[in-house]
Amino acid sequence: MTKSTYVELGEEKTSNQKGNMKRGVSILDFILRLIAIVATLASAIAMGTTDESLPFFTQFVRFRANYDDLPTLRFFVVASAIVSGYLILSLPLSILHIIRSSAGMTRVIFIILDTVMLGLLTAGSSAAASIVYLAHKGNRKANWFAFCQQYNSFCERISGSLIGSFIAIPLFIMLILLSALVLSRR
């Protein structure tokens, strides 16, 4: 009689440990989504509010640098905003996974949508990084001159806004791997 009691307790602990593991992964998923929201939203806001004006000869003639002048920086802002919106909309499902760890179909949806958002964020960040590099270094062969010496504040802000998006990229990779881990343990 005692042997069967031990076996039953052992089975309960194993299934309970599996449930605790899924719950822990779901909590980590939620935290990573919150961090990614902050990173992508801060990147979009920092880039979207970047502009600088420089006087030329007099106060009345000014040269202006704005993120909107370059289509790739516009794409970066739109991509980061879309990813932020997706992450905000995915929070209720992430909370559902904490409460009910057996929701497997939404994990598959998360893997697919997280992968799409990872691609979008990577494309926007890479495109913006190439323009930021050209702004800092220029390209002599194409007669593109580096303008960061003149527009120092503008260049610092657009460079800084890339940091958040490049933080969010590994977070998305971790989110995809966590969802795959939970599905494989199912």
UniProtKB/Swiss-Prot annotation:
Lineage of origin: Eukaryota, Viridiplantae, Streptophyta, Embryophyta, Tracheophyta
Disulfide bonds: none
Identification of the protein by name: Casparian strip membrane protein 3
Cytoplasmic side: 1-26, 96-107, 183-186
Keyword Transmembrane appears in the UniProt entry: yes
Membrane topology, from the record: Multi-pass membrane protein
Organism superkingdom: Eukaryota
GO CC terms in record: plasma membrane
Job description of the protein: Regulates membrane-cell wall junctions and localized cell wall deposition. Required for establishment of the Casparian strip membrane domain (CSD) and the subsequent formation of Casparian strips, a cell wall modification of the root endodermis that determines an apoplastic barrier between the intraorganismal apoplasm and the extraorganismal apoplasm and prevents lateral diffusion.
Keywords carried by this UniProt record: Cell membrane, Cell wall biogenesis/degradation, Membrane, Transmembrane, Transmembrane helix
Keyword set includes Disulfide bond: no
Family: Belongs to the Casparian strip membrane proteins (CASP) family.
Species this protein is from: Medicago truncatula (Barrel medic)
InterPro entries per the UniProt record, alphabetical: CASP/CASPL, CASP_dom, CASPL
BP-aspect Gene Ontology terms: cell wall modification; cell-cell junction assembly
Subunit record text: Homodimer and heterodimers.
Predominant place of localization: membrane
Subcellular location(s) per record: Cell membrane
Residue spans, topological domain Extracellular: 48-74, 129-161
TM region positions: 27-47, 75-95, 108-128, 162-182
